[in-house]
Amino acid sequence: MSNNQIKKKNLLIICRGAGDLATGIIHRLHRAGHRVIALETDYPAAIRRQVSFCEAVYDGSATVEGLTARLLPALNDAETISGINDTPQAHIASQKWKNSAIEAVLEAGEVPLLIDPTGESIALFRPDVVVDAIIAKKNLGTTINMAPLVIGVGPGSVSYTHLRAHETRGNLV
């Protein structure tokens, strides 16, 4: 990815993880004018849950410093909601539904949050950047081929990312 591509506004960025550190990253990227989608597990565990977008998994939405993350149903739930059976047409219809739901949340100035622990949806969205902010001590499925730029945050992200950032907590960061 060239410097001009990185500098442009409105990049589509997927952040794997929505814990307290990931929330800070998401918040800053959103304020910089980028479209950010957060991916989280079914039962997230964050150190500081009251300042974490992962709370949206439990409450449907979470607001941190004026920015709201909104939980969207998983793709399978979208198929159930629309009453469509498991056919190729159903998959296309549910993907259109998912894209329109995500676009509606983004247009509202919020962050869509999807439950996708394996990152399967990343290939569907074809983001400009993937940020692995899961903060696990091992790789949980992120690969360098997921986007033109893949950034790892925390331990264990050296071999599968273009860039790596060390995490630090505190208000002087």
Give, region by region, the residue ranges found by the protein language model.
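Glycine-rich adenosine-cofactor-binding loop
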Residues: I14-T23
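A structured beta-alpha segment of the ubiquitous adenosine-cofactor-binding alpha/beta core
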Residues: T68-F125
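Conserved small/polar residues in nucleotide/adenosyl-binding loops
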Residues: T161-T168
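N-terminal glycine-rich phosphate/adenylate-binding segment common to multiple enzyme folds
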Residues: L114-G154
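N-terminal beta-loop-helix "entrance" segment that forms/cooperates
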Residues: P44-E65
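Gly/Ala-rich phosphate-binding loop of Rossmann-like dinucleotide-binding domains
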Residues: H30
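Short beta-strand "acidic-cap" motif of Rossmann-like dinucleotide-binding folds
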Residues: V36-E40
